[in-house]
Design a protein with these regions (language model features):
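N-terminal beta1-alpha1-beta2 submodule of the flavodoxin-like/Rossmannoid cofactor-binding fold
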Residues: 1-104
Length: 104
C-alpha cells in the first residue's frame, strides 16, 4: 500500500532525524513466505513511513524459521537439532523499535 500525499508531505517536512534508528517487525502470520499475508499489508504501511523518515526497517516471519520451544536461549545446547532463535534474538536486541504483528 502506497503512502498518501499527506503522509509523504509529513515525512518530507519532518524536522526530526531518525536515520540512526533500526526497526524490526516480527510478522507473526501463520503463512510462510512468500504466501500473501494481510498482516504484511499492515506492516508495509508502517514500514514505508519509517523508511521515508530514514529508519532502517526489517521484517521477519517467525514461521519461516525453525524455532525450538523451551526456556533456554539456544535449545541446541539442550538436545534440539536446530534452533533459529539465537539469530532472531540478536536482531531483536539490535533494534531500537520492535513491532510485533499478528493476524486480526
Amino acid at each position: 500500500m502506497a503512502l498518501s500525499d499527506k503522509q509523504i508531505e509529513l515525512c518530507e517536512t519532518s524536522k526530526w532525524d531518525f536515520s540512526d534508528l533500526k526497526a524490526l517487525f516480527l510478522n507473526c502470520t501463520l503463512k510462510r513466505s512468500p504466501e500473501m499475508s494481510h498482516t504484511q499489508g499492515l506492516i508495509d504501511m508502517s514500514k514505508g513511513i519509517m523508511e521515508k523518515n530514514g529508519i532502517t526497517a526489517e521484517v521477519l516471519r517467525p514461521v519461516d524459521f525453525e524455532i525450538a520451544y523451551g526456556v533456554w536461549p539456544d535449545m541446541t545446547e539442550h538436545g534440539w537439532g536446530k534452533d533459529d532463535w539465537p539469530i532472531i534474538i540478536q536482531k531483536v536486541k539490535a533494534a531500537d523499535i520492535l513491532v510485533l504483528t499478528s493476524p486480526i
